[in-house]
Amino acid sequence: MAKINKKVMNNYLKPKLMNSDEDGVRVKVYISGHMIGAGKMELFNLVNKHGSINKAAKTMGMSFSRANMLLDTIQMAFDKPVLTKGSGNKGTQLTKFGLQLLEKYINLCNHLTSESKNFIRWAQSNQ
């Protein structure tokens, strides 16, 4: 697994990028018309964790071809490569830019989740 700031990763693990709770924030960002959201970034993070698109896809219960298509939509938003193949075309790693993208997205999710707590409490108290 490529290195991401430990503080960011520790904060990332609670909440996950894909919010399974009924209450919370799920982030979608549009970059030049390309949507990057929680599901795609969860897959992107799992590629980073496992070093393999196939393992990441299996973890999320999807086919390799679907995972590859979703990762391609992330790549289409940027001129710089976000993924690179391992030596001998085995495995897949995030590029330096890909790691920066993942870290920035995790930071955004953590910030919005933290900031949304007061709003959610207020909204729940007024149901």
List where the protein language model places each region.
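Helix-turn-helix/homeodomain-like alpha-helical modules used for DNA recognition
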Residues: 101-127
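Basic, amphipathic "hinge/linker" alpha-helix immediately C-terminal to the N-terminal HTH DNA-binding motif
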Residues: 85-107
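Residues within the DNA-recognition helix of helix-turn-helix
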Residues: 70
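Central "turn" residue of the DNA-binding helix-turn-helix
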Residues: 61-63
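Short, Lys/Arg-enriched N-terminal segment that forms or immediately precedes the first helix
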Residues: 18-32
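Short helix-boundary/capping micro-motifs
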Residues: 47-55
